Amino acid sequence: MNTQTYTQRAQARPRPRIAVVTMGVKLGDETRGYTRFRVLSEMLVEQGFDVDLITSSFQHWEKAQRDTSKTCYQGLPYNVVFIDEPGYTRNLDLQRIRSHHVAAKNLRERFERTAGRYSLIYSEIPPNDVARVCAEYASEHNIPYVADINDLWPEAMRMVVNIPVLSDVAFCPFARDAKRVYQLLSGAVGTSDEYTARPAKDRTTPYPHATVYVGNDLAAFDEGAREHMADVVKPAGELWAVYAGTLGASYDLATLIKAAALLEKRRAAHTARTAAAGTARQHRPFPPVKVKILGDGPDRQRLEELAWQENAPVEFLGYQDHGSMAAWLRASDITVNSLVKSAVQSIVTKIGDYLASGKPMINTGSSPEFRNKVTTDGFGLNVEAENPGALADVLEELARTPSLRKIMGARGRAVAEREFDQRTSYLAIVNLLRNLI
């Protein structure tokens, strides 16, 4: 065969088509949602694949149906396919479970109508029943299936509802679906080493795998911070500790509020004591620390009431789009990853943005993997969860030691550039999929 004929045949060979399945993604002109699967779809197309990004008609963050006829969902590098889903109003209730069940059923019907279309299926888990449809269909049609494990259900659910016997019965379907997915998968991508290793508990055969943090688009973060920096006004001499994310069951904002109140009382007492003794200049400066809470969620009203009761220097700024959030984080002095003791989350979505800010991080999460990373990489300090006094101690140490903040912040930014920038880190996913097709 001559070179010209070989080249012509190679050019005529159809590009492998991958189904990327996610029930939660920010698309088009939407302002809320995760970008992981959108960015991955774009990169797969750039790397020589055709992609159907299959997602829900229901926008999880807005809790509303999408207008799927909008032009912003068309003309993209990948093909967007919407699966009908009735929707729900809360993140954890029976309505959401039923909604995902309907979506899984409709996804199965869609796969059956398009049999032979895909060379590989890639989906997130959870939702477990949606992932099970993907895994079983791929197995039946002898094509690879790869799970993107970004949370553990039902383990995470037990943190909210843990009633002996009753919880076991209620969560049995989730455990059953997860086990089936883990047994059938051809490969796994986890957003932490813990998640990547989870399928091994339910199978004996090894599987190709990669740990790829959720991360962020570092260039977009920096651009958003530049564009919105003028909107953030910071009084001279004031330090900010910032939390960005959901105000819900997993995230321990109550302890952060109590710690802020305690720290302000300490500062006031210190100022009065040193002023009376005439020794203020002999001590390290003790600047006021204000806590800025970016985000929204079901616990917001309760937390606002707690802040008022504690007379805590805390401001609730509500939901911010990514550019505004980047500006607030860049203007901060300390970032706080505040989780309850029972939280099973490992390396959560916000970590990439915290590190990108170039500011030190306080971590109250209990994940051994992430606590070790905080210490080993040197970008922050770990604190025992649900301990206001311990959190106030660390806030004070960072507030009164500018050099430590600078060193830790620089280390965090370096980690963001090396491990959390989606445009480079996601190449590991692309390569894993390429090797399976």
Segments predicted by a language model, with ranges:
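N-terminal subdomain of nucleotide-sugar transferases
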Residues: 1-74, 261-272
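Conserved donor-binding/catalytic core segment of Leloir-type glycosyltransferases
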Residues: 230-251, 256-261, 292
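Nucleotide-sugar-dependent
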Residues: 251, 321-328, 335-355, 362-372
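Nucleotide-activated donor-binding/catalytic signature segment of Leloir-type glycosyltransferases, i.e.
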Residues: 281-292, 301-324
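A short, well-ordered alpha-helix in the C-terminal region of glycosyltransferases
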Residues: 397, 404-419
